[in-house]
């Protein structure tokens, strides 16, 4: 037994209970000279090798049969590069000693990470292939300040936590280690003795790729190259741009018919992207693609926030999909979930044995609706983890926008909680001040760092200023989903037309608050699940009336101020609710031309017409862009308004929400002349009754509705028509 190392230290190191392996392992100056120590379980012989010559400088003595070796290098006083020749099971291997390398994280990075102000923490934390002192390998870093010991385990060390214990940087709570020879494509995890003395295996919070469920290991892979957002993509996100979003769940848009298996990212690039382009959509919105263990969460309970799910392929396959969308002229929106995370033991929950990422009090840290945990936004490192993630998807994948899920659950402490189940903020209020500051900070940083990318909020309350700048007291989002408009209009449309006259305000109320936010009008995945029925099936009447109602509603929606969002399947009037375990009902479009084809053609024409006419999108958030012409004809359920562009060009939109055609319907207009019908949801092209106005109508100098000139139209039954004024 050597007198240079205490037996208790060796025992603790081998047992995995020693927190400072670099103080023991590697090369050290002692009174006897330079001593090299190594923990190499199952090794039988170890020599210190001079790399340049390959000469054996010293044989290390086995001080413990469990694999602890030590030896003094004669006639050497200064540290030098060395390798170890190790014999395992009769086979000699030449390795570089991980414990001869100095600290990995620079002092400035460590300080910024501790302060929570490192814009790109993913460039430092996680697993990064690197070359140090001429040696190729991978540097690993993980934040676990309360763990007693952390080791890297993986395919490079037989998943043995004794072999690669990490160095703790006490000033930041980060553990680090460079492992020579570990390379891209290998699986790894962190094995730790947590704050309570329990042995845990954890996935890397900053892993750039991960295994597909049910496996949970992280994957070493390089940081993706940055993607520059083009000027065209920036313009496509602006307030005056036409934005028509096709919301998609990649796992159920279409599946292989022979085995019901998912399409890959590359197959989706070849099928989904050209379809969305052909349909005239401007944006693809993807339900969360972060790695997640439970298919039924649709991705909204992510465990790998930095890793695209392997369900559909590799990280590079996903980048291929994004590139294909951009090449087709489609911007890509990613659903982003910074509001909560699942309780799975391999992920963030009680990461180092303490409530590291979540609040410790369940009244703050547990979401009973979803059985998930809530991030502690007041903890700087946690907020930094999330802000960095937002920047990561935009900078490294070319994502054009983030749609933030469940904002209301973040900004209200009493969200879905009864009295006594929540804790007021420091001022006694119900607002989650830390979450509000986190959202403002995220939006501010994205605006500064990736100008042109935007964020959208799914916020279900009337919290003021969601899409207003921070200096105005807002949250700083660019857009907000108008869930009130969605609920009101769907409630109206499901009524039998005979009762709609008593609920006329459900269609007009939206304009009373339209300019308080920058709204997106969403018919999202949430509206076609959990017994709500499909959008088509909510419409009243027989089959003909259901389809007519739906077409009229779409015509109304595409004309109403606000950007558009339609969940997949609704574009061809799928009749059943969405099922995430199966393909959309594409068979409805097989065979002869039918009502489903008609709705699909209508949505395509709506998109292309909406994009072509600036009046339909240029002034969504400016009162000049909208004017009621007929707002009070509730007895006949008729509504008529004007959309207007910056130059004053107008489009008239007229809707008749009863099955009774309205002949010779006169109303006042602003601009006399010939008005051409550019869209009629009752057209035979869409399988309607083909009532209309022969393609065009001339105005009369007959006063109506307080205006000198007027039009006399036929308003088709259960239909919306658009008219544009012909140039003189």
UniProtKB/Swiss-Prot annotation:
Known role: Catalyzes the formation of the alpha-1,6-glucosidic linkages in glycogen by scission of a 1,4-alpha-linked oligosaccharide from growing alpha-1,4-glucan chains and the subsequent attachment of the oligosaccharide to the alpha-1,6 position.
GO biological process: glycogen biosynthetic process
Active-site residues annotated for this sequence: 405, 458
Enzyme class: transferase
SUPFAM superfamilies cross-referenced by the UniProt entry: (Trans)glycosidases (SSF51445), E set domains (SSF81296), Glycosyl hydrolase domain (SSF51011)
Pathway: Glycan biosynthesis; glycogen biosynthesis
InterPro entries cross-referenced by the UniProt entry: A-amylase/branching_C, Branching_enzy, GlgB, GlgB_N, GlgB_N_E_set_prok, Glyco_hydro_13_cat_dom, Glyco_hydro_13_N, Glyco_hydro_b
Keyword Magnesium recorded: no
Family to which this protein belongs: Belongs to the glycosyl hydrolase 13 family. GlgB subfamily.
E.C. no: 2.4.1.18
GO CC annotation, single: cytosol
Record field: catalytic activity: Transfers a segment of a (1->4)-alpha-D-glucan chain to a primary hydroxy group in a similar glucan chain
Keyword Transferase carried by entry: yes
Organism: Escherichia coli O1:K1 / APEC
Keyword terms: Carbohydrate metabolism, Glycogen biosynthesis, Glycogen metabolism, Glycosyltransferase, Transferase
Pfam families the record matches: Alpha-amylase, Alpha-amylase_C, CBM_48, GlgB_N
Protein's UniProt name: 1,4-alpha-glucan branching enzyme GlgB
Database matches in CDD domains: AmyAc_Glg_BE, E_set_GBE_prok_N
GO molecular function, one term: hydrolase activity, hydrolyzing O-glycosyl compounds
């Amino acid at each position: 037994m050597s007198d240079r190392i205490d037996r208790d230290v060796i025992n603790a190191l081998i047992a995995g209970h020693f927190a400072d392996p670099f103080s023991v392992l590697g090369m050290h100056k002692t009174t006897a000279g330079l001593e090299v120590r190594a923990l190499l379980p199952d090794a039988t012989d170890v020599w210190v090798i001079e790399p340049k010559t390959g000469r054996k400088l010293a044989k290390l003595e086995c001080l413990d049969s469990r694999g602890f070796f030590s030896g003094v290098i004669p006639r050497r006083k200064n540290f030098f590069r060395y390798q170890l020749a190790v014999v395992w099971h009769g086979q000699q291997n030449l390795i570089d000693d991980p414990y001869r390398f100095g600290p990995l994280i620079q002092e400035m990075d460590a300080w910024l990470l501790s302060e929570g102000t490192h814009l790109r923490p993913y460039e430092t934390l996680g697993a990064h292939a690197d070359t140090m002192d001429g040696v190729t390998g991978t540097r690993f870093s993980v934040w676990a300040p309360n763990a007693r010991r952390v080791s890297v385990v993986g395919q490079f060390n037989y998943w043995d936590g004794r072999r690669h214990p990490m160095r703790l940087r006490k000033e930041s709570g980060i553990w680090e280690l460079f492992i020579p020879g570990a390379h891209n494509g290998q699986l790894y995890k962190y094995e730790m003795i947590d704050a309570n003395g329990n042995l845990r295996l954890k996935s890397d919070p900053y892993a750039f790729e991960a295994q597909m469920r049910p496996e949970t290991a992280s994957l070493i892979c390089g940081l993706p190259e940055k993607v520059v957002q083009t000027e065209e993509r920036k313009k496509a996100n602006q307030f005056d741009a036409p934005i028509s979003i096709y919301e998609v769940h990649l796992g159920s848009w279409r599946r292989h018919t022979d085995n019901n298996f998912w399409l890959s990212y590359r197959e989706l690039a070849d099928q989904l992207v050209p379809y969305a382009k052909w349909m005239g959509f401007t944006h693809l919105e993807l339900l969360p693609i972060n790695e997640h263990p439970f298919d039924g969460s649709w991705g909204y309970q992510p465990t790998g926030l930095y890793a695209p799910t392997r369900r559909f392929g590799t990280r590079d396959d996903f980048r291929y999909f994004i590139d294909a969308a951009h090449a087709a002229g489609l911007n890509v929106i990613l659903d982003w979930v910074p509001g909560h995370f699942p309780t799975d033991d391999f992920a963030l929950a009680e990461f180092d044995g303490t409530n590291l990422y979540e609040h410790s009090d369940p009244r703050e840290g547990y979401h009973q609706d979803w059985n998930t945990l809530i991030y502690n936004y007041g903890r700087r490192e946690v907020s930094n983890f999330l802000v960095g993630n937002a920047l990561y998807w935009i900078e490294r994948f070319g994502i054009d926008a983030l749609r933030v899920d469940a904002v209301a659950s973040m900004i209200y402490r009493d969200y879905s909680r009864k009295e006594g189940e929540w804790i007021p903020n420091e001022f006694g209020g119900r607002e989650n001040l830390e979450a509000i500051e986190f959202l403002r900070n995220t939006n501010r940083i994205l605006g500064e760092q990736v100008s042109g990318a935007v964020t959208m909020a799914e916020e279900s309350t009337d919290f003021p200023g969601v899409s207003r700048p921070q200096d105005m007291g807002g949250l700083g989002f660019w857009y907000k989903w108008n869930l009130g408009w969605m609920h009101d209009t769907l409630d109206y449309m499901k009524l039998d037309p005979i009762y709609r006259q008593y609920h006329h305000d459900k269609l007009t109320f939206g304009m009373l608050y339209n300019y308080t936010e920058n709204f997106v009008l969403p018919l999202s995945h949430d509206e076609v699940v959990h017994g709500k029925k499909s959008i088509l099936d909510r419409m009243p009447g027989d089959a003909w009336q259901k389809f007519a109602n739906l077409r009229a509603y779409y015509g109304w929606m595409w004309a109403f101020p606000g950007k558009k969002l339609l969940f997949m399947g609704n574009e061809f009037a799928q009749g059943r609710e969405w099922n995430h375990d199966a393909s959309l009902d594409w068979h409805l479009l097989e065979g002869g031309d039918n009502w489903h084809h008609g709705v699909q053609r209508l949505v395509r024409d709506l998109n292309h017409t909406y994009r072509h006419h600036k009046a339909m999108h240029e002034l969504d958030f400016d009162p000049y862009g909208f004017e009621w012409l007929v707002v009070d004809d509730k007895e006949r359920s008729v509504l008529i308004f004007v959309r207007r562009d910056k130059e004053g060009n107008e489009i008239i939109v007229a809707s008749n929400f009863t099955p009774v055609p309205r002949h010779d319907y006169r109303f006042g207009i602003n601009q006399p002349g010939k008005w051409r019908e550019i869209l009629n949801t009752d057209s035979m092209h869409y399988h309607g009754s083909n009532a209309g106005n022969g393609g065009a109508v001339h105005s009369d100098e007959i006063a109506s509705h307080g205006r000198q000139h007027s039009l006399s139209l036929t308003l088709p039954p259960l239909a919306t028509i658009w008219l544009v004024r012909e140039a003189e």
